[in-house]
Amino acid sequence: MQYVTPDLCDAYPDLVQVVEPLFSNFGGRDSFGGEIVTIKCFEDNSLVKDQVDVDGTGKVMVVDGGGSLRRALLGDMLAEKAARNGWEGLIIYGCVRDVDVLAQTELGVQALASHPMKTDKRGIGDLNVPVTFCGVTFRPGEYVYADNNGIIVSPEPLSMPQ
């Protein structure tokens, strides 16, 4: 499904929250959206690795990496697994790596920046808890939509206006 966030904002101005414009597109899909699944972690992508193995059909993984610019929370191997398992996309409040491969992967990926260093795997983090960054709280079970214009959050699913 192709989402256009300006059109969604125009159609649902009282329903959506707009995330501060700090993110860039790194994935092969410029537009994506779905039900929110959250991960809160810091320089440890163990839970991201676990979740990409789960069926993500219709879902977007929102990863609160604390805004760290020192390690990448997603790379090519995890992105390819996420795409194979039906994830619509990932929004990473942190960094990604292997960006040339990510751009070829059928997956939406938005993040703050790229960084070549991988994370440690210490098994530390929280799954499906509300996370807040860039002026918005992301709650599991709510909905997020992203494109080259930005990222928006809604408490309910949105349809593109006709």
Curated annotation (Swiss-Prot):
GO MF annotation list: 4-hydroxy-4-methyl-2-oxoglutarate aldolase activity; metal ion binding; oxaloacetate decarboxylase activity; ribonuclease inhibitor activity
Protein residues bound to substrate: G75, D76, M77, L78, R97
Sequence positions that bind a divalent metal cation: D98
Cofactor(s) required, per the database record: a divalent metal cation
Keyword Lyase set for record: yes
Domain of life: Bacteria
Quaternary state and interactors: Homotrimer.
Family the entry assigns: Belongs to the class II aldolase/RraA-like family.
Protein name stated in the entry: Putative 4-hydroxy-4-methyl-2-oxoglutarate aldolase
